[in-house]
Each structure stands twice: as structure tokens, then as C-alpha cells.
């Protein structure tokens, strides 16, 4: 299986609850390496650009408002089958449907404020990583 990279975002609700370390522990315990990370407060324009594919959806305005409501932590995760592994760790989008032991089951309260975002495919991961990180900001891990 090939080494992959995926984008992960710890959303404002989880940052506000001081869950960054707990979520990072989940990534690392699953064998994912954090090869790029930054904390930032998205502008409205940044959030609209990142979620542009949802622009015509009824939840778009609320999503942009939520994602700009406080700081987020954005990271690049690397590992074998990283996209699927991260999605398994996150759990279902709706925390009420997420399996016990997943990030969303343990830390999220609603489908709108669901703690984390993760790329859904290797193609979207590449696009999402480049939205937040330059090549120089992603480290090569050798150990």
C-alpha cells in the first residue's frame, strides 16, 4: 500500500474545548504522522474558497460562519492509506451516527459542529493540502 497524505482540520468547536492534543494523539496512535501543522483564524474569503464546492448548498452560509467563528488547526497527515485511516478515526459526519471511539462520537455534539474535517479522497487531499500549505511547509519525515 502506498504512502498517502491527507488534510485534516480541527474545527473551532474542538479547538475551543482544548481537544487539539487529544485529537493529535488519535492520529499518532493510528500510525499517522503529522508532517505539517498550523493554527489560524480563517477569513470569510478563505472559508468560502475552501468550501467553494458547497456554495450552492443550503448549509453553505452557516458552514462559513462556523468555520470563521474561532481558530482552527490545519494539519497534513501522512501514512499508509492515510485518507481512509483518517476518515475511520473521525467517524461519520453526524456524531449521532459515528461509531463509539471515533473523534466525532467522543467530541462532537452536532452535525454542524462536528469537531474535524478530513479529505475524502487522495485527489481532494492534494487540492486541500495545497490550499493551506506550500511545499516548503510540509516536512519530509524519514523516521
Swiss-Prot record:
Query: Which interval of the chain is the signal sequence?
Result: none
Q: What is its EC number?
A: 2.7.4.6
Residue sites binding ATP per the record: 11, 59, 87, 93, 104, 114
* Any single GO BP term: GTP biosynthetic process
Q: Superkingdom of the source?
A: Bacteria
Q: InterPro entries this protein is in?
A: NDK-like_dom (IPR034907), NDK-like_dom_sf (IPR036850), Nucleoside_diP_kinase (IPR001564)
Q: Where in the cell is it found?
A: Cytoplasm
Recorded GO cellular component terms are: cytoplasm
Reaction catalysis annotation:
a 2'-deoxyribonucleoside 5'-diphosphate + ATP = a 2'-deoxyribonucleoside 5'-triphosphate + ADP; a ribonucleoside 5'-diphosphate + ATP = a ribonucleoside 5'-triphosphate + ADP
* Keyword line: ATP-binding, Cytoplasm, Kinase, Magnesium, Metal-binding, Nucleotide metabolism, Nucleotide-binding, Phosphoprotein, Transferase
Required cofactors, per record? Mg(2+)
Catalytic residues in the record: 117 (pros-phosphohistidine intermediate)
Class of the enzyme per the UniProt entry, highest EC level: transferase
Sample GO molecular function, one term: ATP binding
Quaternary structure? Homotetramer.
Its biological purpose: Major role in the synthesis of nucleoside triphosphates other than ATP. The ATP gamma phosphate is transferred to the NDP beta phosphate via a ping-pong mechanism, using a phosphorylated active-site intermediate.
The record's similarity note reads: Belongs to the NDK family.
What protein name applies here? Nucleoside diphosphate kinase
Q: Which organism is it from?
A: Idiomarina loihiensis (strain ATCC BAA-735 / DSM 15497 / L2-TR)
Classification lineage: Bacteria, Pseudomonadati, Pseudomonadota, Gammaproteobacteria, Alteromonadales
Name of the gene this protein is made from: ndk
Amino acid at each position: 500500500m502506498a504512502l498517502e497524505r491527507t488534510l485534516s482540520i480541527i474545527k473551532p468547536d474542538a479547538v475551543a474545548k482544548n481537544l487539539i492534543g487529544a485529537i493529535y494523539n488519535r492520529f499518532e496512535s493510528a500510525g499517522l504522522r503529522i508532517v505539517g501543522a498550523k493554527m489560524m483564524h480563517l477569513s470569510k474569503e478563505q472559508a468560502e474558497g475552501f468550501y467553494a464546492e458547497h456554495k450552492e448548498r443550503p448549509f453553505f452560509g452557516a458552514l462559513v460562519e462556523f468555520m470563521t467563528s474561532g481558530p482552527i488547526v490545519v494539519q497534513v497527515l501522512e501514512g499508509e492509506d492515510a485518507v481512509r485511516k483518517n476518515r475511520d478515526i473521525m467517524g461519520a459526519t453526524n456524531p449521532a451516527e459515528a461509531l463509539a471511539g471515533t473523534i466525532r462520537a467522543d467530541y462532537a455534539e452536532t452535525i454542524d459542529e462536528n469537531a474535524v474535517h478530513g479529505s475524502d479522497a487522495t485527489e481532494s487531499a492534494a487540492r486541500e493540502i495545497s490550499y493551506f500549505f506550500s511545499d516548503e511547509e510540509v516536512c519530509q519525515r524519514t523516521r
